[in-house]
Amino acid sequence: MDADWDEVTRIAFPAPGSNDYPRPATALAFDTIAELLWAGNDRGRVVSFYGRDLQRYTAFKIHPPSEGPVRQFLFHDKGVIALGTRSVHMAMRRGPTLWNIRHDEMENLQCMSFTSKGASEIIVAGFQDTMFVIDVVKGEIVKQKSKYICAATRTGCVDLLDPITFKTVRSWQAHASYINDMDAQNDFIVTCGGSLKQQAAQTYMLDPYVNVFDLKNMTSMKPMPFPPLAAHVRLHPRMLTTSIVTSQHGQMHVVDIMNPNTSNVRYANVMSFINLFEIAPSGEALAMADTECNIHLWGSPSKIHFTDMAIPIEMPKAEEPAPMLDWSPDTPLSSIGMPYYREQLFSAWPSDIISDIGAPPVQLDPSFLASLKQMEWGFYGRNSRGLRRNQVEDTRACMKPSMQPPKFLSEKARESAMSYSAAVPDPKVEQVPESSTDELESLKPEAPPIYRNLEIKYSKFGVDDFDFGYYNKTQYAGLENHIPNSYANSLLQLIHYTPLLRNMALQHAATACVTDLCLLCELGFVFDMLQKAEGSTCQATNMFKALGATPQAAPLGLLEEETHVPSLSTMSQGLSRFLFDRINHDYRSINPISTTLEQTLFNLPQPPTPDELVSRVLATSAVVTIKCMNCRSETTRPGTAQVNDLMYPPPKGSARGGRMHKTTFSQVLKTGVERETASKGWCSRCQRYQNLQMRKTIHSVPAVLAINSAISSQEHRKLWATPGWLPEEIGIIVDQGQFFCFEGEDLKLHLQRGMHNITVYSLIGMVVNIESSSPQKTHLVSVINVAHADAAPSAESKWHLFNDFSVRPISTAEALTFNAAWKLPAVLLFQVKAANNKTNMDWKTKLDTSLLYQDLTPHSDEKTYHVLDLEAEPPGPDTIVGLDTEFVSLKQPEIQMNSDGERETIRPMSHALARVSVVRGQGEHEGEAFIDDYIAIREPVVDYLTLYSGITPGDLDPRTTKHNLVSLKVAYKKLWVLLNLGCKFLGHGLRQDFRVINIQVPRAQVIDTIQVFYLKARLRKLSLAFLAWFLLKEDIQLETHDSIEDARTALKLYRKYLEFEDAGILEAMLEDIYKVGRATNFKPPRKDDQVIQRTDTPFLSR
């Protein structure tokens, strides 16, 4: 404490409200990262003061006034944490609440502290048996605490608690009766308290000393005398052995713990008692609060500040007064508010006299700039940009993306109907622009349009109105990207085009597996969709829902909405490890349908077991040898891995006069697979931590070699950007525990010699990270050689770029060229060349259909369905089944107003499947349901859409439902089995049903009555209720929808359609239907006195 220290500011602590009287502060603390002083009172109100003048900054309540005082403050980089008697409250420094936590066992909280350095959690304690550890936010802790938790008890004891187990490590009796104040810092604890002076009168008095305890040696030290009776004590934050002690009347002593007999004395001019005392983190300020509701700030007037590295304080913006306008002939019209007008203004200049100014600068290639030579007046070089001398480049046209968003399908339909030329497409719109052949897209300085992140646009008709076909002219299906966790689209595509993995997924999905969160089944369902789509766009909604519900996914940082992983590349690599582990686990759970192809491929005497097949396809079998560098002892453990991380050589400086060593992909892969590393670890022989050396001995490599690129430095990026660095084929030899890898000419030489048992692997493809600059978002694409997955082998490579729903062919050079600035691989898959084009379709002929004949509620008297008869009703390609579903809403649509004042849909309403009904379409029991499943939904439902779905909250609750409630997996698999048996699905508006179910049905297996009763020239599709009223003379959907009733009605309409077609009057009937529809507004008329009593789905009895 310098000689010029004195009271700098004194303010009155504000009253809790305008009608209340001032109250003393109950908590006082300096902010650790801002120039703020915080105080709280006994009414739960928190107030902050800014700077040396204690200017009032913010004020808010942390709990109701009846809950008592504010106890303590802690500070985090995101806000301030305030402790009440029954709650913990965190708010931003400018006031808004971040969170407020309460608990039934929070009875009388007294104190809190951060648990440890680097942990974003606090421990809260009080006069109760339970301590609470609260997770604050994920971020950096700005204040370090000691090794132990120091706790003061009611009886005057100081207990040291282990922060992990909360057990008492050491205890001291500091004071006879109670502890009034305590502080801990570095290796010292200081306390001041009181003792009972008169037993009969129960009179307590503060002790005339301060106790000191040494945490390093776990001993008590010589007390510091303080004759004025010590009321408060604080350790100096900068001087390790200095403390400041104060009495209730304002006498302050600055005392050295090691020399307590000498002190520096100051006096604070207070008219009452001091009840709070704090020192700033900088050590340059003191704050005291007295019982007369005053706050005193002490320090050196010339250098007082609260913290050394203070963040700027966000102050409220001053409201700008309205400008004064002087009306004159020179005043611009735009400065005055304009009324609404209907005629064109004179200021509306025609476009031919308006020109753009301030064109953006030319984007120059970094390689072109590097080739220029510097002179005193600037740079010069060869003109390699293709422009003539003094020619100006139109940079506005260059910056416009070459791939403009397409028109909505409804817009195209209207334009086609108006021009009567629907068969002639507009080449400017329909044709996807092709990249220039002069230069590879991957060599451009920034990501070109074909690699950029694409967004789905929504019209009032939803996502079905978006023209996905504009982005994909190939036979290979893309995936929609507006679903949570759709960053995994690229990895799903890569696995799908790996034949061995696709075979495993489809074989497993065709078994009797009904495990709810089986990701291998979900992969099989997605792969089946992609195969059946034939170039249409699919979605992996059910797969991502299962991934999100898997307990291990969130802790591993695999979910987009809950992760704080810095890059999508890291998430994709983590997902590859997780999915391969799940494939390994799920495939072993049940015997596959058929493994004859794998038996032939691996040359086995009998079909492999699930364990054997998983090991041969996925696992790099190895043993890790751990060697202690001190005692030279060695231990071994299994080191099998499904995914290998590449390991790059350390960076080396270029030696003068010597040649730089060329690093090949094969060398990096060998280093990554064998993985020789050194680290600190426990040696059981030395009984202490030693330097350990670890190395893998490789026994076998899998048929599918999954590799994470593990790029972490600029040197790694430059290595990948080397032309031709990634080979399309590699050769691997495993001999006597060593792994050898060859590529290019070395591979050809080994194959010609034939001396070693070398296995050739083909590059299937890779997940590529595209790092785009703002406003584009970084995202993932996949680059895949689909030739290895086609049914027939191809002599040439067929590289394709899968950018979510955009799919296009690219050249081999484009596929294997990377750019250190924006295009780098994250995950690579190699497969044994002998397995290319090997597709096992035995699962279709041996499909497990037992689920169709299982009655999950056999003893219910209120059944609305009867399952199929195994003998009399086997479904097949000639079977027609009526289908209808009901949905509920999980998320409301996100809508915003655009710059034109129009409503624009950012994200449409999110639906979930709630009920699936399937009825027989032929036979003796035609129209009778054999599936009527209600779906148990995990996600919170925001709207049951009861008016349209007939679903009520009790229908989907396992505790109250009267219906057949099943998991989404069971309901989906029944439909998937029917689909792969070749059944035809009949219904009305099935496109939306299939979308919510998340299933892809070929057109040949769909009979949609909304299409058969549709005139394209009318641009109006007819509702089921209207068709039923006009053609069947039936009234349906009077109050709510019933899926069984709707499926039966669609079946009856289809029978009518067949009658009209056989009679040759279909076109005439359609004209009559539309004619009557226009007169009734395409709605079935209702009689005014008609009273409708809606009932539930009728029960069936046989």
From Swiss-Prot:
The protein's matches in PROSITE patterns, at most eight in alphabetical order, are given as: USP_3
Q: What is its main location?
A: cytoplasm
**Localization, UniProt:** Cytoplasm
Enzyme class label: hydrolase
The cofactor named in the record is:
a divalent metal cation
For the Exonuclease domain, which residue ranges apply? Answer: 881-1054
Reactions catalysed according to its record: Exonucleolytic cleavage of poly(A) to 5'-AMP
Q: Does the keyword tRNA processing apply?
A: no
Pfam families, per database record: PAN2_N, RNase_T, UCH_1
Describe where the WD repeats fall, as residue ranges on this chain: 20-59, 104-144, 269-308
Residue ranges occupied by any USP domain in the UniProt entry: 446-833
Report if keyword Cytoplasm is assigned: yes
Q: Which residues bind a divalent metal cation?
A: D884, E886, D993, D1046
Residues covered by region (Linker):
308-445
* GO BP terms: mRNA processing; nuclear-transcribed mRNA poly(A) tail shortening
Q: What EC designation does it have?
A: 3.1.13.4
Explain what switches its activity on or off, per the activity regulation comment.
Positively regulated by the regulatory subunit PAN3.
* Recorded GO MF terms: metal ion binding; nucleic acid binding; poly(A)-specific ribonuclease activity
Arranged from A to Z, the UniProt key words for this protein are:
Cytoplasm, Exonuclease, Hydrolase, Metal-binding, mRNA processing, Nuclease, Repeat, WD repeat
What does the note under cofactor report? Binds 2 metal cations per subunit in the catalytic exonuclease domain.
GO cellular component labels: P-body; PAN complex
> Domains: what does the record tell us?
Contains a pseudo-UCH domain. This ubiquitin C-terminal hydrolase (UCH)-like or ubiquitin specific protease (USP)-like domain is predicted to be catalytically inactive because it lacks the active site catalytic triad characteristic of thiol proteases, with residues at the equivalent structural positions that are incompatible with catalysis, and it cannot bind ubiquitin. It functions as a structural scaffold for intra- and intermolecular interactions in the complex. The linker, or PAN3 interaction domain (PID), between the WD40 repeats and the pseudo-UCH domain mediates interaction with PAN3.
The record's listing under HAMAP family reads: PAN2
Give the protein's biological function.
Catalytic subunit of the poly(A)-nuclease (PAN) deadenylation complex, one of two cytoplasmic mRNA deadenylases involved in mRNA turnover. PAN specifically shortens poly(A) tails of RNA and the activity is stimulated by poly(A)-binding protein PAB1. PAN deadenylation is followed by rapid degradation of the shortened mRNA tails by the CCR4-NOT complex. Deadenylated mRNAs are then degraded by two alternative mechanisms, namely exosome-mediated 3'-5' exonucleolytic degradation, or deadenylation-dependent mRNA decaping and subsequent 5'-3' exonucleolytic degradation by XRN1.
Q: Which family does it belong to?
A: Belongs to the peptidase C19 family. PAN2 subfamily.
Q: What is this protein called?
A: PAN2-PAN3 deadenylation complex catalytic subunit PAN2
Q: Which organism is it from?
A: Chaetomium globosum (strain ATCC 6205 / CBS 148.51 / DSM 1962 / NBRC 6347 / NRRL 1970)
